[in-house]
Amino acid sequence: MNTWFSKSEKMTTKPFLETTKYIQEVHLDVSKYHDLNKQLQLLKLTKQDLAILKQLQPYTKDLIPTMVEQFYASISLSPDLMHIIEKTSRIEKLKITLNKHLSDIFNSRIDSAYIEERKVIARVHVRIGLRSKWYLASFQSLMSSFIDFIQTIEMPPREMAQAVNAFSKVINFEQQLVIEAYEHEEERIREEAENVK
């Protein structure tokens, strides 16, 4: 487990989260996507959750690089995944992309641009042959890194749980976007192959 703060700065009962202070800085608008509105309702992903992540944004200067390193360390355990990556890109370039991707999460602006960017990433992964199960499994590394990180911040256990829940909801939402984009792209590729026959 990484330690971003000293032991004296750890868990307390003093409130830490101030979502009302950050709620005006977040943006949640998926009105162009009827199904996504339903998905957000099922997840109970709200502006309140985004405000929690926004408040944590200043702390992510050290967190995000750690998440990126741990993410690629877990991927490197699979020779097949490394072969796909090395065949199509460079790890350093992908690390920069993931760094931006994670920064966007803590920027707490979920809108059309955010959604379309995630869909593009998923389509690229389909085209390079990265199967959805590997992409989805890699999200666990991000979740584990976040949980380790949140335990280093001085806040009541209840608020830690709220922060983990907020991050988990966004990650789950992203996984749903990825699965849907994978399905659409795989269907498009199948249709193209059938048209060639």
Kindly give the residue locations of the regions a language model identified.
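Residue-level detector of well-ordered alpha-helical segments, enriched
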Residues: 59, 63-67, 71, 94-98, ...
